[in-house]
Regions:
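N-terminal alpha-helical modules
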Residues: 9-157
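Sec-dependent signal peptide recognition
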Residues: 1-3
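N-terminal signal peptide c-region/cleavage motif recognized by signal peptidases
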Residues: 5-7
Length: 157
């Protein structure tokens, strides 16, 4: 659980990933239904009295984005380790195949600027409005959650 105390009069906000985890536990990670779980915990956080302010919304959305980012980094590491081992085995066997590790790295490096551009566009749609900060955090949360789930669906394949 992550806490925010007294930020700009927001009082105490707490982010707990429980709602998202519960949703994921009931979904099949290989199906699009898992995508519906993205934002569940941020929504629960924003449903609290202090979560409905602009500062509160930004905090809640950012907290879930950071949670998904940690999850994405963990699954990326798992996949990279497995892919490096598979690439080494293919080389040992003399099989010329595209590198899984290099392909994963290239894909992830291309995805990051896509995510950033998509969320820059989301921010731009708000002009100078105060909702732009939470909108950007929400976009980053959704894009990162989708990428984490996409990579998680590759585990065990």
């Amino acid at each position: 659980m992550v806490m925010l105390a007294g930020a700009a009069g927001a009082g105490d906000l707490a982010f707990d990933p429980g709602a998202t985890l519960s949703c994921l536990a009931q979904s099949d990670l290989n199906r699009s239904g898992a995508f519906d779980c993205i934002g569940r915990s941020a929504s629960a956080c924003m449903a609290t009295p202090d979560g409905g302010t602009t500062v509160g919304m930004g905090y809640c959305l950012n907290a879930e984005w950071q949670w998904w980012d940690a999850r994405l980094n963990a699954v990326y590491s798992q996949l990279m380790n497995g892919h490096r081992a598979a690439d080494a085995e293919m080389a040992r066997l003399g099989i010329a195949a595209p590198s899984l590790a290099d392909s994963l790295q290239a894909m992830q490096r291309a995805w990051i600027p896509f995510r950033d551009a998509a969320c820059d566009y989301e921010r731009a749609t708000w002009g100078n409005g105060t909702g732009g900060g939470p909108a950007t955090a929400g976009c980053l949360m959704v894009q990162t959650g989708r990428q984490a789930l996409a990579l998680e669906s590759r585990l065990g394949q």
